């Protein structure tokens, strides 16, 4: 938090192409590293995201993992992660470029009461990763993450039966 106002942070203003972060989640059970809740959490996220956005180049990106959160004492999900998404975009005046889902099948069952004890919910095995930027066209190149065509697709292309023409 204090980095953005430090001498080192000030030197980096407008010079960072990518910031990838996973801030502390608003957990129901407190942890040693901090556990802000509700409006306090949203205010904190807004302050931090404004500072991070100031570090970005004009075509830079901020990528944030926002974990799921549950309402205390009931088997319902909190809206705080979605409010966090909106707070980051609004407070920092950033565009939401894309959403990714991080599926973690090895995640411990949770929330434990509702998954293991009462058996009312399934394991919460994913989190959202949100890509923000100052511009609608940030520095990006999807060719860096493409996977090879399947054999079936290669055969379609080879036969010429695949219509790779203009799309609407």
Residue ranges of predicted features:
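Core catalytic lobe of class I
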Residues: 1-168
